[in-house]
Swiss-Prot record:
Annotated CDD domains: cytochrome_b_C, Cytochrome_b_N
Chain residues that bind heme b b566: 98, 197
The protein, known as: Cytochrome b
Lineage: Eukaryota, Metazoa, Ecdysozoa, Arthropoda, Hexapoda
One annotated GO biological process: mitochondrial electron transport, ubiquinol to cytochrome c
Record GO cellular component, one term: respiratory chain complex III
Subunit details: The main subunits of complex b-c1 are: cytochrome b, cytochrome c1 and the Rieske protein.
Transmembrane segments: 34-54, 78-99, 114-134, 179-199, 227-247, 289-309, 321-341, 348-368
Keywords: Electron transport, Heme, Iron, Membrane, Metal-binding, Mitochondrion, Mitochondrion inner membrane, Respiratory chain, Transmembrane, Transmembrane helix, Transport, Ubiquinone
Alphabetized Pfam families for the sequence: Cytochrom_B_C (PF00032), Cytochrome_B (PF00033)
Superkingdom to which the source organism belongs: Eukaryota
Length: 378
């Protein structure tokens, strides 16, 4: 019997097994769309970034003006720049929803897939941070100064490490050049890590909303989920284009329209909105090293989930108390994002500290309450 080319061809067969003939659970909801949406975001970022890099100059005397030149003089440069900046915001919205789905439905039990996902999250956060420095506005410069300075909290090695990252005794031309280099290369490392993420996922198959084995009820990925994904693509792209064409600088910081000036500190230094929750956690610890540890742990704590799973069911769909706790945690993250944008004064400091405790408490108490609920129903 003649097999189709997509099965016979050595390269097409890989694509076929990932996108066409992949057996997928018949009942996965729209919450499973974010993986493909993230891939779309990554492609948008790589393509717009590639064209921006053709016109950008990584030099402290030229960087700000080169971004200005892109927006004013390059054909559709304004569109490339705003698509890239807002594309990053959509990337993080999709990542946070993707992670939230994984926590809710117990997808973290695919341990290798989950751990690679946590690594991807760190890589994407690093990439976005370095990208924010490139326009060399006030917030770019001071954001880079404050965040890189956190390395000095590391005992013994700290000061040397900071000067090594800076390439000197302050954030200067060497810093901008290396940040541009890393910002260019990291998305391709993210792309490679994404392929490993997908490889691990296809070893086990997808989870589903009821968390049971779905081998008896699988359907081919194409046409069912290709079309479902395309609907997601259209919706997200439309919202992104509307934002870019109506209010492209809504999510940015006005201070970044002022060229970087080492002699003038902005009133309130803050990162992009998608890092504010972690920034609020960092600020809520009144100790430099403690703050840095809390900052890293706010993301790294996701890696403990597969090893601290005590329930009889896969997700929290069948645990009413844990569902309430989950949504409290979601609201906590939103409130932390708001606190991160507020000045360091009362009552914001205290509220930030309370929210930080609630955030970390979720990961500690959630499995224990699940265990208690299981025992209650035995």
């Amino acid at each position: 019997m003649n097999k189709p080319l997509r099965i016979k061809h050595p390269i097409l067969s890989i694509t076929n097994s990932a996108l066409v003939d992949l057996p997928a659970p018949s009942n996965i909801s729209a919450w499973w769309n974010f993986g493909s949406l993230l891939f779309l975001c990554l492609m948008i970022q790589i393509l717009t970034g590639l064209f921006l890099a053709m016109h950008y100059t990584a030099d402290i005397s030229l960087a700000f003006n080169s971004v200005n030149h892109i927006c004013r003089d390059v054909n559709y440069g304004w569109l490339l720049r705003t698509m890239h900046a807002n594309g990053a915001s959509f990337f993080f919205i999709c990542i946070y929803l993707h992670v939230g789905r994984g926590i809710y439905y117990g997808s973290y039990l695919f341990t290798p897939t989950w751990l690679v996902g946590v690594i991807i999250l760190f890589l994407v956060m690093g990439t976005a941070f370095m990208g924010y420095v490139l326009p060399w506005g006030q917030m770019s410069f001071w954001g880079a100064t404050v965040i890189t300075n956190l390395l000095s909290a590391i005992p013994y090695l700290g000061i040397d490490l900071v000067q090594w990252v800076w390439g000197g005794f302050a954030v200067d031309n060497a810093t901008l050049t290396r940040f541009f280099t890393f910002h260019f290369i990291l998305p391709f490392i993210v792309l490679a890590a994404t392929l490993i993420h997908i490889l691990f996922l296809h070893e086990t198959g997808s989870n589903n909303p009821i968390g049971v084995n779905s081998n008896i009820d699988k359907i081919p990925f194409h046409p069912y989920f290709t079309f479902k994904d395309i609907v997601g693509f259209i919706m997200m792209t439309m919202i992104l284009i509307l934002l870019v064409l109506i209010n492209p600088y809504l999510l940015g910081d006005p201070d970044n329209f002022i060229p970087a000036n080492p002699l003038v500190t902005p009133v309130h230094i803050q990162p992009e909105w998608y890092f504010l929750f972690a920034y609020a956690i960092l600020r809520s610890i009144p100790n430099k090293l403690g703050g840095v540890i809390a900052l890293v742990l706010s993301i790294a704590i996701l890696a403990i989930l597969p090893f601290y799973h005590l329930s009889k069911f896969r997700g929290i769909q069948f645990y009413p108390i844990n569902q309430i706790l989950f949504w409290i945690m979601v609201v906590t993250v939103i409130l932390l994002t708001w606190i991160g944008a507020r000045p360091v004064e009362e009552p914001y400091v205290l509220v930030g500290q309370i929210l930080t405790v609630i955030y970390f408490s979720y990961f500690m108490f959630n499995p224990l309450i699940i265990k208690w609920w299981d025992n209650l129903l035995n």
